[in-house]
Curated annotation (Swiss-Prot):
Record-given protein name: Gamma-glutamyl phosphate reductase
Pathway in which the depicted protein is active: Amino-acid biosynthesis; L-proline biosynthesis; L-glutamate 5-semialdehyde from L-glutamate: step 2/2
Organism, as annotated: Rhodococcus jostii (strain RHA1)
Predominant localisation class: cytoplasm
Gene: proA
Family annotation (SUPFAM superfamilies): ALDH-like (SSF53720)
Keyword tRNA-binding: no
Amino acid sequence: MDTREAVHAAARRARTASRVLALLTTAQKDAALHAAADAVLAASADILAANAADIETARASGTEDSLLDRLRLTPERIEGIASGLRQVAGLPDPVGEVVRGSTLPNGLELRQLRVPLGVVGMVYEARPNVTVDAFGLALKSGNAALLRGSSSAAKSNAALVVALRTSLAAQQLPEDAVQLLPSDDRSSVTHLIQARGLVDVVIPRGGAGLISAVVRDATVPTIETGVGNCHVYVHSAADLEMAERILLNSKTRRPSVCNTAETVLIDAAIAETAVPKLLQALQTHSVTVHGDLPGLVPATESDWSEEYLTLDVALKVVDDLNAAVEHIDRYGTGHTEAIVTSDLAAAREFTARVDAAAVMVNASTAFTDGEQFGFGAEIGISTQKLHARGPMGLPELTSTKWIVWGDGHTRPV
């Protein structure tokens, strides 16, 4: 069987499984999620051993520390993965929710209900936790998950999927509700994203190159996620102590994730005081600052659009709020933008004008996260406007169906 047929066969099995999942009760899905969490914890030794092998291979090939951090699993991270499954079990089930409804003058009763999408394909890099996050959210929303991880996490992903499939079988549910496509054949991505009619949506998570390639080449509908050139704008009315805390948290908490700040914009009206203070704070935390000011790494045009994902940040002094918004419009990726200010009018103008999935006022960009938003584990952070935007939880993994109840109604000629 060639790769194309293998992917299509997996998609057909996923379709069959999805029909079973769509009819499960909330209690059945929640029980399956708790069983999956138990299975992941029970298999933690095997999962950690597989991950150690992936880490060793990646390190030997010269993988950067930021990418190793994305790849690495620890006992604490496995506990977090299991906890994420339990959190999803505790979330409201979107399937069957009435979005809107009415009774027409002729007596027909209309209801628009949430229903599963069907087969959800995921193409993702490095992070093995995405394997379980995708499974958990897909299962709770009644979808089958068809996963294509990166070769760098092949052993980790395989160990996780073995645990998940074992738990499904123990619950007498179809194991093909989650399948892992081969990561050693690049063509499997192409065949997945072009399996129109077999796969309902593909969600890419990873670097800009992966995401743009999937969106460009797919014939299956896609949801673009993740590339985050996020800005923190320190307004002229900012509390500089607050600005320092927010900037450091946005940049240094986990620099390898997509909601990290990559550029800080400082209002010219306070630059004389703000620049030295914020520079010292950043440099104390080992952040390399790129910019046009003396003593910084000279910035090039590419720095303003760079998603570093490292302890690097670009710094620019801007004339005012209008200039900050124009800079963000030009270089931002529509992910998360933040303003630090005590001026309510300025905050409202910033939130109204900035075009992004999330806009923060006096808060770290790190809060753009499904768990932080109360969604549980997220399937990704959408930076497009259709079909979802921002952190994608359970409702974003559903479509809708119109149910019309009549009593012998016929439409007049």
